[in-house]
Amino acid sequence: FEAIIKPLDYEVSKMRTIKSEDELKIIEKACRISSLAHIRAMKSVKPGMYEYQLEAEYVHEFMSHGARACAYPSIVGGGKNACILHYNENKNILNDGDLVLVDAGCEFNNYASDITRTFPVNGKFSKEQREIYEIVLEASKKSIETVVSGSNPLKAHETSVEIISQGLLDLGLLEGDVNEIIESNKYFDFYMHRVGHYMGLDVHDVGGKDINGDWLNYAPGMITTIEPGIYINESLDVPEEYKNIGIRIEDNVVVTETGFKVLTDLVPKEVNDIESLMNS
């Protein structure tokens, strides 16, 4: 007889891409625990703390709610460390006047969560920090709006690129025509990663592409992160007051039958809400 041997990885990936109701409940729980941890950190941070001490606040909150592990090594980057995408040494002092970028999420019953928030160590954004933050926030909101059934993940990324490029142009940190900036990838010096990835049993989960490697359209039950960012390292030719500002905002979003649901909206991300929480 004849037998046809086919790899199963693609079929298994498809199954993992669409979450069942039971899976969604677990992931929602993981997202809630991680959200509470970010809130705890915003209330706890103060100048003079070490990055690892702030990291400990997350671990404490995770375990207090039954999440015994982090979904990935936490990133706690203060000041210029926030401009390093996968910084996880977490060993430096958090200084007055700096921002701290924290990318941290727990694993609960084998499922991941993945949240990033950026907030001022002293509880108050500077003018320049706020200007950059508002660009990233706008990119976050508009990109999330594209996470609906039938839309393609490329649209979410392109939306974030357009908003970030225009925002940097408006501030004078990029020059030229916005379309030329995008086509020539000039924005890439400030925003060098994709806007999101699928999430589930792994924090960077499998699936999302067809057998030819093309992105599948969003469908109900898919969970993606949306995480635009701007990273202004000290080597860039920009005014001194903008250097070493690194900002990312990351939420976990599930596609529903009627639109989308943000699983991590418990954590504030509006500037006024963050400052109010930190100074309460």
Feature-to-residue mapping (PLM):
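Active-site neighborhoods and metal-handling regions in enzymes and metal-associated proteins
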Residues: F1-S280
